[in-house]
């Protein structure tokens, strides 16, 4: 805590308001609200905190505060400040997505469309739906039952949908506005769950079609009835009153909060929204902040009712949402809130279980590996692999794992400089010497374990360099592969022995990931180098084509094949002189050049013969 913060803490009032934490760059990193600014802000700089709060406090260099008249005013101000500044430590919704709605437009001849924007334009909106796929599924069903206008064709024309019975083409059929308004009401009833009338009508049409031997049409009606039934089963009935409501529940544990929102539309649970985040204040206060952001950030249709848990300030939510706010005490609505709370608890438990498994895969694996090899826990592991084809473009690569996870910023590539031909042992000797000679010279952090992708020979070479030449004391292990090129055995010790390692253990899976990663990194580098060398060698020896022009050609055409296929004019456009461009084509396409020369010679011979035969 610096002197500026100490001085400001003495000046804090006991009023409600918002406080704004800033980092060394003056950037707002956290916005909070408080019933008592003095107590809340001082609490950040006193006593011990959990890890996430310690991380926040470590970055605070300055703070500001704004006094408000009430707690609710502080809540509204906090939400606006978060929206405006997007502080990195605040609750931020996972994304800014808006949910799709089905809309019946308020036009003379209504249309049925999908939209993500709810406007006060007289249209009828139904939703939100969990995703556009779900909305499209329902709209496709409605299109087959209700032939709304779909086109904007002139009066003399009809659209494709007219021919398949999904557009009434009002300009041709002369249907009046009342017909379409009536159909809009039927759709509204259908989407509210009152679909028995539609099903009865479809059953009647199916029976009539069957009686007149129109079996294909009868089958279409049957499919529609089945589709409605399928839709019914997907939308579980949660309430008998067919109301639209959002149901909130939350659960907290280990400094984290999960909020779940159930979207109940026309009495059916159609989707839920789940968010997990660390909280820094009282849980009920951060829950209110979340609710405010939820309705402010999303293009969200405010429902008839919002159901909230018992411990939440009802008046505060009313200030955030223009809807009927209920804290149900019993019955069906109470069960809905309890269900949301239960799901929030389950989601949070799943997060911690996954986190434990992740720790087991990484931290647990390196601890077990250390015990198995009887060395200190190998926090930093460096692994090496060589790659070459018949000794051409030999390379080596090093990958680094820290705390059981790849540390890609520490990866290194090596071109083999002192070895001629395919000599894997000599290549390993060179790379180990270069890497750990540099570690010594520059006092770099040495690894806790070196893993060589290879057998006894490669490991012994690495040991000679590390222990005898450089005098370093770093444990070295080898990973041998089987004939299927899969991780097979771990070699360790002096003399080297096969370590008894369970293939189902997390430490085995860690070594497998390390071996796969170093192999991938080495072979990718080798391919890049081989491709580059191939490109350079084929363009070497062309007068006027230096490294810069070669680079420009590669940057423009991306590959040697495309340069071969390019015309002289296309090569000239890259900034290569015409004579040089012609030389490039001659070098890359010798057969075509030879054919052209042959044709030119034949043409000259023919013209010469013709001149000799003239009188």
From Swiss-Prot:
Name of one Pfam family that matches: UvrC_RNaseH_dom
Cysteines paired by S-S bonds: none
Cellular localisation: Cytoplasm
Entry keyword Cytoplasm: yes
InterPro entries: GIY-YIG_endonuc, GIY-YIG_endonuc_sf, GIY-YIG_UvrC_Cho, RuvA_2-like, UVR_dom, UVR_dom_sf, UvrABC_protein_C, UvrC
Residue ranges constituting the GIY-YIG domain according to the UniProt record: 14-91
Highest taxon listed in the record's lineage: Bacteria
GO cellular component: cytoplasm; excinuclease repair complex
SUPFAM superfamilies reported for this sequence: C-terminal UvrC-binding domain of UvrB, GIY-YIG endonuclease, RuvA domain 2-like
Domain UVR: 196-231
An annotated Gene Ontology molecular function: excinuclease ABC activity
Predominant place of localization: cytoplasm
GO BP term, pick one: nucleotide-excision repair
UniProt KW keywords: Cytoplasm, DNA damage, DNA excision, DNA repair, Excision nuclease, SOS response
Subunit structure: Interacts with UvrB in an incision complex.
Family: Belongs to the UvrC family.
Protein function: The UvrABC repair system catalyzes the recognition and processing of DNA lesions. UvrC both incises the 5' and 3' sides of the lesion. The N-terminal half is responsible for the 3' incision and the C-terminal half is responsible for the 5' incision.
Protein's recorded name: UvrABC system protein C
Species per Swiss-Prot/TrEMBL record: Streptococcus pneumoniae serotype 19F (strain G54)
């Amino acid at each position: 805590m610096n002197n500026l913060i100490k001085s400001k803490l003495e000046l804090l009032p006991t009023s409600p308001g918002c406080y704004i934490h800033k980092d060394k760059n003056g950037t707002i990193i956290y916005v909070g609200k408080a019933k008592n600014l003095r107590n809340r802000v001082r609490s950040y700089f006193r006593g011990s905190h959990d890890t996430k709060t310690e991380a926040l406090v470590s970055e605070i260099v300055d703070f500001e505060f704004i006094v408000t008249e009430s707690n609710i005013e502080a809540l509204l101000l906090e939400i606006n400040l978060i929206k405006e500044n997007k502080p990195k430590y605040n609750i931020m919704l996972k994304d800014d997505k808006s949910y799709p709605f089905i809309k019946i437009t308020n036009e003379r001849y209504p249309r049925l469309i999908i939209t993500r924007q709810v406007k006060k334009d007289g249209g009828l909106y139904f939703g939100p739906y969990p995703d556009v796929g779900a909305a499209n599924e329902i709209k496709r069903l409605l299109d087959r039952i209700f032939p709304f206008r779909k086109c904007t064709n002139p009066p003399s024309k009809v659209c494709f949908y007219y021919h398949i019975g999904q557009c009434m083409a009002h300009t041709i059929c002369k249907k009046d506005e009342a017909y379409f308004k009536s159909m809009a009401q039927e759709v509204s009833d259908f989407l509210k769950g009152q679909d028995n009338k539609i099903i009865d009508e479809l059953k009647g049409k199916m029976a009539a079609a069957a009686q007149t031997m129109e079996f294909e049409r009868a089958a279409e009606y049957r499919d529609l009835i089945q589709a409605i039934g399928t839709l019914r089963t997907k939308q579980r009935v949660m309430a008998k009153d067919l109301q639209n409501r959002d149901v909130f529940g939350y659960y907290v544990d280990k400094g984290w909060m999960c909020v779940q929102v159930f979207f109940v539309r026309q009495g059916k649970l159609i989707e839920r929204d789940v968010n997990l985040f660390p909280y820094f204040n009282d849980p009920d206060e951060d829950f209110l902040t979340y609710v405010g952001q939820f309705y402010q950030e999303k293009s969200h249709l405010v429902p008839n009712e919002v159901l909230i848990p018992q411990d939440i300030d009802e008046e505060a939510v009313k200030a955030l949402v223009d809807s009927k706010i209920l804290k149900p005490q019993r019955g069906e609505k109470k069960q809905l809130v309890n269900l949301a709370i239960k799901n929030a608890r389950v989601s949070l438990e799943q997060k911690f279980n996954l986190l434990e498994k992740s720790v087991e895969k990484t931290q647990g694996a390196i601890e077990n590996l250390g015990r198995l090899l009887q060395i200190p826990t190998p926090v930093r592991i460096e692994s090496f692999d060589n790659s070459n084809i018949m000794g051409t473009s030999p390379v080596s690569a090093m990958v680094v794992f820290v705390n059981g996870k790849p540390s890609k910023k520490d990866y290194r590539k090596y071109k083999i400089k002192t070895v001629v031909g395919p000599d894997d042992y000599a290549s390993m000797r060179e790379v180990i010497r270069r890497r750990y000679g540099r570690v010594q010279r520059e006092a770099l952090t040495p690894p806790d374990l070196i893993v060589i992708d290879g057998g006894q020979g490669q490991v012994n070479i690495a040991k000679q360099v590390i222990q005898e030449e450089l005098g370093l004391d770093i444990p070295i292990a080898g990973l041998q592969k089987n004939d299927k090129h899969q991780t097979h055995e771990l070699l360790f010790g002096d003399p080297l022995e096969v370590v008894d390692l369970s293939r189902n253990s997390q430490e085995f899976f860690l070594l497998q990931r390390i071996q796969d990663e170093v192999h991938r990194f080495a072979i990718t580098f080798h391919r890049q180098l081989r491709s580059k060398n191939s490109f350079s060698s084929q363009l070497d020896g062309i007068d006027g084509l230096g490294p810069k022009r070669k680079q420009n050609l590669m940057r423009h055409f991306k590959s040697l094949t495309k340069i071969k296929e390019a015309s002289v004019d296309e090569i000239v456009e890259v900034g290569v002189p015409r004579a040089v461009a012609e030389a490039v084509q001659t070098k890359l396409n010798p057969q075509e050049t030879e054919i052209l020369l042959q044709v030119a010679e034949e043409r000259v011979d023919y013209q010469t013969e013709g001149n000799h035969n003239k009188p």
